[in-house]
Amino acid sequence: MMDLWTAAQALILGVVEGLTEFLPISSTGHQIIVADLIDFGGERAMAFNIIIQLGAILAVVWEFRRKILDVVTGLPKQQQAQRFTLNLLIAFMPAVVLGVIFADTIHHYLFNAITVATALVVGGVIMLWAERREHTVRTETVDDMTWSDALKVGLVQCLAMIPGTSRSGSTIIGGLLFGLSRKAATEFSFFLAMPTMVGAAVYSGYKYRDMFRPDDFAVFAIGFITSFIFAMIAVRALLKFIATHSYAVFAWYRIAFGLLILATWQFGWIDWASAKA
């Protein structure tokens, strides 16, 4: 039987996942921090994280359903659809290879709040530098991307294996530096999230399959639905925001949040060193 506090924990973490998954502020980092603050851990947390990530990715699938349908129906004959699909596969593969090789090691050594805080600050500084650097836009839309554009974005996505880095942050900022327009970089980041997150969820789901229990269905349902709703809100808001704004506000948020975590640890207010995902 699910108690009220467990339901509240599921709701809180679902909101955090939904709001942060597609913003360049690191959803994994926020999950580690918030889960530690509300004391949500153990085997249930491992399975729960997989479920709420699926909720978030479903929001992107729904938001871009027309584009996805156009690509799927156009695959047999349309060169544009074929090239777009190939670019996604090319961008996806580096994360598959490096994820299989290094995922367990990274999770063991780097999934802690101090790593998250450091990565938030460093990533924020890099984002500010990238935003202030002059960009020569070579690629206006995702349909104009070349296979080399896709490969480079896929390689920088691998940096997000370090918690606190941000998958969307690394791919969007990387895309800007590689000559993609702000719109193209953001949209390709969303599309690339689909195979990347689904692949990670399937891999983790199989690996931790014994942690899924029927008794946790209600907890998972709350997290899944909440994550879906708030991810939808975040995706739509970000697409509107980037049309007229830079990513600097996210960079400053990362720096401030990371420094706050480091300060509370340094002064001994919170024992972040023991916080694990």
Swiss-Prot record:
Nucleotide-binding found in the keyword field: no
Q: Name one GO cellular component term.
A: plasma membrane
Single GO MF descriptor: undecaprenyl-diphosphatase activity
Catalysed reaction equations from the record: di-trans,octa-cis-undecaprenyl diphosphate + H2O = di-trans,octa-cis-undecaprenyl phosphate + phosphate + H(+)
* InterPro entries reported in the protein's UniProt record: UppP (IPR003824)
Which keywords does UniProt give here? Answer: Antibiotic resistance, Cell inner membrane, Cell membrane, Cell shape, Cell wall biogenesis/degradation, Hydrolase, Membrane, Peptidoglycan synthesis, Transmembrane, Transmembrane helix
Q: How does it sit in the membrane?
A: Multi-pass membrane protein
Task: Indicate the transmembrane segments per the record.
Answer: 5-25, 44-64, 86-106, 110-130, 184-204, 219-239, 255-275
Cellular location(s): Cell inner membrane
Reading the lineage from the top rank, the first entry is Bacteria
What's this protein's function? Catalyzes the dephosphorylation of undecaprenyl diphosphate (UPP). Confers resistance to bacitracin.
What family classification does the UniProt entry report for this protein? Answer: Belongs to the UppP family.
PANTHER family in alphabetical order = UNDECAPRENYL-DIPHOSPHATASE (PTHR30622:SF3)
Q: Mention any additional remark.
A: Bacitracin is thought to be involved in the inhibition of peptidoglycan synthesis by sequestering undecaprenyl diphosphate, thereby reducing the pool of lipid carrier available.
Return the protein name. Undecaprenyl-diphosphatase
Query: Can you name the source organism?
Result: Pseudomonas savastanoi pv. phaseolicola (strain 1448A / Race 6) (Pseudomonas syringae pv. phaseolicola (strain 1448A / Race 6))
What gene codes for this chain? uppP
